[in-house]
Amino acid sequence: MEKYEKAAEIFKAFGDPTRLMILKLLAENGSMCVCKIIDELKKPQPTISHHLNILKKAGIVKARKEGTWNFYYIVDDRVKEIIKLVDEL
């Protein structure tokens, strides 16, 4: 059951257009600071942070700190393949 609960959490994280756009940016760029994601998506910082936290909680992305900046990146390359499939729809 635990495996399916984790899978459901991951699928829920994929279930939002903003999160899919964030994942597309990360798939294309490797890693990005929050400020660049905000600039690209033209959404407020609290909105982007909220979505990044959901992706992080689901284990899809991680953050690394460089000085005062947080850089986010995709943990598993299979996520990049999922984003490619979404782009082909």
UniProtKB/Swiss-Prot annotation:
InterPro entries found in the cross-reference section: ArsR-like_HTH, HTH_ArsR_DNA-bd_dom, Metal_resp_trans_reg, WH-like_DNA-bd_sf, WH_DNA-bd_sf
Gene3D superfamilies, per the entry: Winged helix-like DNA-binding domain superfamily/Winged helix DNA-binding domain
RNA-binding found in the keyword field: no
Single annotated GO MF: DNA-binding transcription factor activity
Domain of life: Archaea
Pfam families reported for this sequence: HTH_5 (PF01022)
Residue ranges of every copy of the HTH arsR-type domain listed in the record: 1-89
Positions of disulphide bridges: none
Keywords assigned by UniProt, alphabetized: DNA-binding, Transcription, Transcription regulation
Record's protein name: Uncharacterized HTH-type transcriptional regulator MJ1325
